[in-house]
Amino acid sequence: MMKKIDVKILDPRVGQQFPLPTYATSGSAGLDLRACLDEAVALAPGATTLIPTGLAIHVADPSLAAVILPRSGLGHKHGIVLGNLVGLIDSDYQGQLMVSVWNRGQDSFTIEPGERIAQMVFVPVVQAEFNLVDDFDATDRGEGGFGHSGRK
């Protein structure tokens, strides 16, 4: 059975002036989030700001969470990434989705009303249960890390 996520539209422009989030293709994992702005916002190099999406979600199911991720084109072409790098939306959060954007580029960038600024993906959640142990069963890799397995 497919799970449903409750989405509350906080701004009447969403679904009218600005499209609802949709999956671009049948294979898309992420929904595009749009800037729900009254007017364009100029983001100077090095600056951060919070951009409203006009949406609130309540995932409700503790086996799911949502993550907000940058859009690859904005980051690669313009240096616009998320100010917190990744946004995590816990299942019990019920507030508006705000996107922290950071201009890590060298030029000012203008975010227009309705512009796609980030994407949201729903992911399964597994909570760890900690068990205190004296050691682990031996593996070939052991404690090797940070380049231990080589480049090829």
Swiss-Prot record:
What are the protein's UniProt keywords? Hydrolase, Magnesium, Metal-binding, Nucleotide metabolism
* Native organism: Enterobacter sp. (strain 638)
The disulfides recorded in the entry are: none
Name the record gives this protein: Deoxyuridine 5'-triphosphate nucleotidohydrolase
Catalysed reaction(s)? dUTP + H2O = dUMP + diphosphate + H(+)
Pathway-wise, it operates in: Pyrimidine metabolism; dUMP biosynthesis; dUMP from dCTP (dUTP route): step 2/2
- Pfam families, sorted: dUTPase
E.C. code: 3.6.1.23
Q: Which family does it belong to?
A: Belongs to the dUTPase family.
* Annotated binding of substrate, by residue: R71, S72, G73, N84, L88, I89, D90, M98
One Gene Ontology term of the molecular function aspect: magnesium ion binding
Q: Which InterPro entries match?
A: dUTPase (IPR008181), dUTPase-like (IPR029054), dUTPase-like_sf (IPR036157), dUTPase_trimeric (IPR033704)
- Function, please? This enzyme is involved in nucleotide metabolism: it produces dUMP, the immediate precursor of thymidine nucleotides and it decreases the intracellular concentration of dUTP so that uracil cannot be incorporated into DNA.
Tell me which cofactor or cofactors this protein depends on.
Mg(2+)
Q: What is the lineage of its organism?
A: Bacteria, Pseudomonadati, Pseudomonadota, Gammaproteobacteria, Enterobacterales
SUPFAM superfamilies (alphabetical): dUTPase-like
Any transmembrane segments, and where?
Answer: none
The Gene Ontology biological process terms listed for this entry are: dUMP biosynthetic process; dUTP catabolic process
